[in-house]
Amino acid sequence: KRHSPVLFPIVGKLKRNQTIINGRTYEIRQHGFARDMEFEPVTKLDNFHSYLLKCNKYTQARYPFDFELYNTYRQEANKLIFIYKVINTGVTNMPFGLGGHPAFKIDPDDLKRGNYYLEFAEEEDRTHFLYLVDGLVGTEYAKNKLINNRIIALDEHTFDNDALIIKGIQNKKISLKNSRTRKTVLTMEFDGWPYLGIWSKPGAPFICLEPWQSTADRIHSSNVFVQKPDMIVLEPGQEFEAKFSVQFFN
């Protein structure tokens, strides 16, 4: 089963689930292959766990690059820090996308009744909600769902048209709150991540808050991998690291 999967080497869907790399067509399914692969334990301490995924024949058949992907968790009191590091171990430039997909337990009845909401730490007047067409990013923006430039109301119909994907967030701090209990459930800080995805499966006892470096293909995508918007490109030997944190409240 998937538990807090890492999205790599893509986030979201590719047009026709295919992409072109160096003139050859490859198939990569939604959110990439890393989320379905077993990572090797590297370090296990009481408050620090680190895991590693290395390229192999399976990944090379879908993504012809040499890499190491580290997934690390560090606990500090009631805060959990997620750290992702990608290293280009090959001899050519390596483009990729990266994202987190952690899920957090909620009461599905409270979601159904509209008791949950998300609140940014400050007013956000430059945000845009991406509009998805069969999982691909459309040419127009979706309706802005922010109330008073700060609050996103949540209920059982919030995700009828797939995930909410927000870009242009200035203050990268958001809290999940419950109006019935008048409590803050958690606060996420995601500085350095251009996008935030929000999603829940109908009737599920969880909600996903997903910091992303990139998004799905556009509906008019050329399918050429290096032409995807927001790709991170590492030169041989270079590495990229990004982190976010979640603070939990009783």
Report residues per predicted region.
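Short, basic/aromatic beta-hairpin or loop at an interaction surface
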Residues: 1-4, 210-222
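Acidic, contiguous internal or C-terminal segments within carbohydrate-active enzymes
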Residues: 55-109
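Active-site/ligand-binding surface loops and adjacent short beta/alpha elements
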Residues: 103-106, 110-190
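Extended, loop-rich substrate-binding clefts of extracytoplasmic carbohydrate-active enzymes
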Residues: 22-77
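Beta-strand-rich interaction surfaces with strong enrichment in secreted/lumenal proteins
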Residues: 70-72, 229-234
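Glycine-rich active-site loops that engage anionic ligands at enzyme catalytic sites
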Residues: 178-217
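Short Pro-Gly-centered flexible turn/kink motifs
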Residues: 19-27, 84, 232-248
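Acidic-aromatic substrate-binding/catalytic surfaces of carbohydrate-active enzymes
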Residues: 1-21
